[in-house]
């Protein structure tokens, strides 16, 4: 009886006998190592067989349809130049199938050659590494090309959306103090203001009443401008007065924070409030906002990388305004549809702008979440301030919203 060959790592124990030059199964307990199941290319027919051993084929390998086992055997044989060492005790007359394929390496190799497997397609290690690198480079190139193609084919705003975008942009520009000239017209809050906290807050922070007084002087016109912005939006003016009030109370601090954040100046490390007062982080913090100040400054620093234009800021404000989850709203569905209309026009405008920042649109939408959190934190902070600070310091409109 022939013993298993040590040359082929896939060799199996001998459990067949030779009759008339052909191998036959000796026992029904003979184990068959079939090719591993896995990804099968779409060009193969169902249950297509390996042309060498008849096992289930996995693809087109070295110019033939073969299984993984015969592919690996042929590759190792050529790479390690093993075929000169192969021999057959039965004059090369072995029948090769999935049961006997590991018993005679010479006949298996001859079968590989006879069915058309190409030796010249087997690469050595260095060529295989180079080929794999080339494949990866081509895959990465195709990925970039597809990404560019998808960006080019993303829809820009429709004519109706352009009209809406124009209205929202003009509403923002006409209610945004100092416009694009804010840097030239801003005045820095004196450094000695906001450095000497006097009134204590329950959370341990201090409030500089002089700085707080300065901020309250600009808060009323800032709130008025947010209200005017909302009234210039057609969808907002169509809502019941009760819903308009709820939406304005909910978004007022969020929109004012956004307007301040987009006027962050990294050189002076200041935010410009209401288009006129430039303040540092500690001044805003000691002036009553506490930790909310850090959130607004951090937002300003992150937004500076986005290079938002007036239209994008305006559409962000419209999305914040039309938030259907505000408590007490009557026309929830209508408001939700309004916000969806703004969001779709916003997304199409982002496509039109073609920003270089990867995943610009989802990253920008996350800023809406940040602004909502700032609004919620400010509401909580404001409740404490009403208790700790003299009531006469609060403007009536500020108390109302």
From Swiss-Prot:
Q: Where is this region: Disordered?
A: 1-20
Q: Which residues bind DNA?
A: 50-124
Query: What's an example GO BP annotation here?
Result: positive regulation of transcription by RNA polymerase II
Superkingdom, taxonomy of origin? Eukaryota
Sequence ranges assigned to domain NR LBD in this UniProt record: 160-401
Q: Where does this protein hold 3,3',5-triiodo-L-thyronine?
A: 225, 274
Q: Map out region (Modulating) in residue numbers.
A: 1-49
Which parts of the sequence carry Phosphoserine? Answer: 11, 27
Q: Which Pfam families match?
A: Hormone_recep, zf-C4
Which InterPro entries is this protein grouped with? Answer: NHR-like_dom_sf, Nucl_hrmn_rcpt_lig-bd, Nuclear_hormone_rcpt_NR1, Nuclear_hrmn_rcpt, ThyrH_rcpt, Znf_hrmn_rcpt, Znf_NHR/GATA
Primary location class: nucleus
In its keyword annotation, does this UniProt entry include Metal-binding?
A: yes
Q: Where in the cell is it found?
A: Nucleus
Alphabetical keyword list: DNA-binding, Metal-binding, Nucleus, Phosphoprotein, Receptor, Transcription, Transcription regulation, Zinc, Zinc-finger
> What molecular function does GO assign, one term?
zinc ion binding
Residues bound to Zn(2+) 1 are: 50, 53, 67, 70
- What's written under domain? Composed of three domains: a modulating N-terminal domain, a DNA-binding domain and a C-terminal ligand-binding domain.
This chain's function reads: Nuclear hormone receptor that can act as a repressor or activator of transcription. High affinity receptor for thyroid hormones, including triiodothyronine and thyroxine.
Family per similarity comment: Belongs to the nuclear hormone receptor family. NR1 subfamily.
Q: What is this protein called?
A: Thyroid hormone receptor alpha
| Organism expressing this protein natively | Cairina moschata (Muscovy duck)
Organism classification, top ranks?
Answer: Eukaryota, Metazoa, Chordata, Craniata, Vertebrata
């Amino acid at each position: 009886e022939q013993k298993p060959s040590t040359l082929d790592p896939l060799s199996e124990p001998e459990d067949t006998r030779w009759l008339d030059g052909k191998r036959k199964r000796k026992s029904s307990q003979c184990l068959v190592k079939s090719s591993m199941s896995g990804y099968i290319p779409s060009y193969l027919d169902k249950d297509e067989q390996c042309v060498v051993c008849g096992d289930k084929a996995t693809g087109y390998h070295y110019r033939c349809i073969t299984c993984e086992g015969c592919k690996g055997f042929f590759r190792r044989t050529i790479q390690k130049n093993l075929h000169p060492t192969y021999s057959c005790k039965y004059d090369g007359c072995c029948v090769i199938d999935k049961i006997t394929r590991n018993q005679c390496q010479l006949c298996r190799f001859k079968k590989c050659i006879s069915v058309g497997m190409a030796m010249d397609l087997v690469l050595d290690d260095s060529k295989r590494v180079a080929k794999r690198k080339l494949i990866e480079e081509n895959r990465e190139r195709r990925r970039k090309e597809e990404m560019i193609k998808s960006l080019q084919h993303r829809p820009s705003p429709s004519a109706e959306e352009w009209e809406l975008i124009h209205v929202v942009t003009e509403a923002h520009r006409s209610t945004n103090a100092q416009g694009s000239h804010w840097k030239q017209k801003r005045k820095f809050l004196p450094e000695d203001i906001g450095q000497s906290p006097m009134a204590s807050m329950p959370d341990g922070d201090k409030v500089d009443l002089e700085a707080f007084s300065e901020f309250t002087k600009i808060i009323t016109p800032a709130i008025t401008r947010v209200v005017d912005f909302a009234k210039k939006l057609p969808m907002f003016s169509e809502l019941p007065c009760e819903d308009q009030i709820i939406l304005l109370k909910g978004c007022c601090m969020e929109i004012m924070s956004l307007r301040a954040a987009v006027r962050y100046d990294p050189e002076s490390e200041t935010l410009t409030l209401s288009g006129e007062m430039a303040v540092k982080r500690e001044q805003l913090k000691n002036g009553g906002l506490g930790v909310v100040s850090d959130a607004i400054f951090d937002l300003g620093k992150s937004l500076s990388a986005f290079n938002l234009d007036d239209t994008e800021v305006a559409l962000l404000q419209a999305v914040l305004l039309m938030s259907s989850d505000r408590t007490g709203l009557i026309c929830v569905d209508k408001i939700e549809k309004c916000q969806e209309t703004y969001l779709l026009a916003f997304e199409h405008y982002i496509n039109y702008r073609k920003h270089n920042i990867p995943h610009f649109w989802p990253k920008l939408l996350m800023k809406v979440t940040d602004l909502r959190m700032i609004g919620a934190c400010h509401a909580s902070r404001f409740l404490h301030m009403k208790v700790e600070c003299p009531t006469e310091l609060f403007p009536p409109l500020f108390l109302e919203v």
